[in-house]
Design a protein with these regions (language model features):
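Intrinsically disordered, low-complexity protein-interaction/activation regions
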Residues: 5-183
Length: 183
């Protein structure tokens, strides 16, 4: 899957090998990005982060990052607009919260698009999800029993989000099952 964008009358800058920038053609440019060759790793243990080709992705806002974290935790199942609103904006009037949520989702999608990985998002009317086939996640691999990921769990799962605490008993039980020990 690739994408093609036509940019008209925009001066385009290209990073040079020595870290400088040089202007490219002004006029119509077709930008093609092959997103098949992008490696995406999502880390949930000891904090939530997303890596694209080994580099940490920075998010436009903490709410955009948390929104993605919620979708990742649901492992491909959809999160309704109401659920997402409650988790991100618990103490805000519903209409305002839903408007905020739309803006946050737009920013998240644009940020992921800048890195060629917006394909991980699935948006349907009134619900949000991630396509779990598009990335590797320590949480998913741990649940599958992948030995390379079992040792990564140190008892901490997205500690920056209070709602993630509900998953810890399940993860600790799995860890005990895999290792025959306590954590």
């Amino acid at each position: 899957n690739g994408f093609v964008t036509n940019l008209k009358a925009i001066e385009w800058y290209i990073l040079t090998k020595n870290g400088g920038m040089r202007p490219e053609i002004t006029g119509e440019i077709t930008l093609m990005a092959d997103t098949e060759n992008v490696n995406i790793f999502i880390k949930t243990f000891d904090g939530f982060d997303v890596y694209v080709n080994g580099k940490m992705l920075y998010f436009p806002s903490s709410k955009a990052k948390e929104m993605l974290a919620i979708m990742v935790e649901k492992r491909g199942s959809s999160v309704s607009l109401s659920q997402m609103t409650y988790l991100l904006y618990e103490n805000i009037e519903e209409r305002t919260a839903k408007n905020n949520l739309r803006v946050v989702y737009y920013r998240l999608r644009m940020n992921l698009m800048e890195h060629g990985i917006e394909r991980i998002l699935i948006k349907k009317r009134g619900s949000y999800a991630v396509d779990t086939e598009q990335f590797i996640c320590d949480f998913y691999e741990f649940i599958k029993g992948n030995p390379d990921y079992i040792t990564l769990f140190s008892g901490s799962y997205m500690p920056e989000y209070a709602w993630a605490d509900d998953m810890l008993p399940y993860l600790r039980n799995l860890y005990r099952k895999y290792n025959g020990g306590l954590i």
